[in-house]
């Protein structure tokens, strides 16, 4: 089975806009319907409904990161299988056959290269690294607990030349150096306020925003807040 329907709600974000993953997922009615929600550098972020099982397939040119927001899925591959629960993710590397499925409805974020690979700039891994040969499951909550210091983003996964990172902290974070590309900020737990020179947003669990490229921004968070960030690796 392939995706029944694919949509896009991406917009050019000159200023901060709040988006909600549960609200987006609630509007997807059919199994394997999908909506593109953001383009961060070269990485396209989509939300899809996993219910049933897709056919086996492989992508010769792109990695795919599966991040379960709600529910649970089985990700099968030529490297074995992993069961992903809410807040867990795994990367199916380029060239590795795989498929995803779930008996019950699950909301999943899918991250992969959104531009033609031949037109990409910068570093690219052209094939799966020998010796890996297994899917690695990452629990974002556990990964955040392993970060020793507050306000320090730590990389937990890579997709092409971009990194997915987690951090925790309470209070005001240091002002971030402007990024040459836009970046994705997601609230896993707690509440975060994002400020730029143009706007301010309050984000709650399941909310995300895109910080425009070159924008100076600052975060402030409440107790027990965990954030997820995706940006191009510097």
Stretch-by-stretch model annotation:
Residues 2-46, 118-166:
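A short, N-terminal "cap"/entry segment at the start of jelly-roll beta-barrel domains
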Residues 32-33, 51, 61, 93-95, ...:
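Short beta-strand-initiation
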Residues 41, 69-70, 85-86, 104, ...:
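A cytosolic small-molecule/anion-sensing beta-strand core signal
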Residues 44, 53, 72-74, 81, ...:
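Structural motif
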Residues 49-51, 58-77, 111, 168-170, ...:
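Short, conserved beta-strand element in jelly-roll/cupin
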Residues 78-95, 197-214:
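Short acidic-glycine-tyrosine-enriched beta hairpin
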